[in-house]
């Protein structure tokens, strides 16, 4: 199943507005940006994969833990792989830790933001998929699997900018 769906990239407002034809005519969910690795796992196998669609050896123990608590569903869980204390301005260190071939990463967790039920790619609105993700995170019930909170939903670039400024005023990205 992994080759069916292309990896979706997050849009960053300041980069999008610099484009000749910015894609700003849709409704978007707003999340705070953190320094993490894009990852996904497919149910029922529960093997954590990177953007390059490779298994990540440094989080094998987390894959095994999730597999032991997996709900009886089929689909793809999409998330950022994070390490406590490495969320802001420490991507290069996080990258080195997650690139390890034999040593397990410590204090690793997943910030879940999407779930594609039954591998029905691109047939369901993002907010409905997020509601499925919420249910899956609750059913897994592990502190290492966390829901990434939505800060807002809007199709108004002024609201996006106001949210970005609010986050930046608190030291976020």
Residue ranges and their predicted role:
Residues 14-18, 91-94, 155-161:
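Short, motif-level signal for alpha-helix interfacial/capping segments enriched in acidic residues
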Residues 150-173:
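Amphipathic alpha-helical
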Residues 20-143:
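Covalent nucleotidyltransferase
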Residues 1-25, 30:
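Charged, flexible boundary elements
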Residues 1, 139-151:
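Short, basic, glycine/proline-bearing loop/turn elements
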């Amino acid at each position: 199943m992994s080759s069916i769906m292309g990896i979706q990239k997050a849009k960053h407002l300041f980069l999008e507005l610099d484009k000749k034809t910015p894609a700003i005519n849709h409704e978007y969910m707003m999340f705070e940006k953190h320094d993490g690795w894009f990852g996904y796992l497919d149910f029922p196998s529960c093997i954590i994969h990177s953007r390059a669609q490779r298994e990540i050896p440094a989080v094998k123990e987390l894959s095994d833990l999730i597999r032991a608590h997996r709900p009886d569903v089929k689909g793809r869980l999409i998330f950022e792989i994070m390490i406590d204390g490495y969320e802001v301005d420490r991507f290069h260190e996080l990258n080195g830790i997650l690139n390890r071939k034999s040593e397990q990463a410590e204090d690793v967790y997943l910030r879940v933001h999407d779930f594609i039920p039954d591998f029905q790619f691109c047939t369901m609105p993002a907010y409905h998929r997020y509601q499925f993700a919420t249910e899956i995170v609750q059913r897994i019930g592990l502190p290492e699997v966390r829901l990434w909170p939505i800060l807002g939903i809007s199709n108004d670039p002024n609201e996006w900018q106001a949210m970005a400024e609010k986050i930046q005023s608190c030291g976020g990205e």
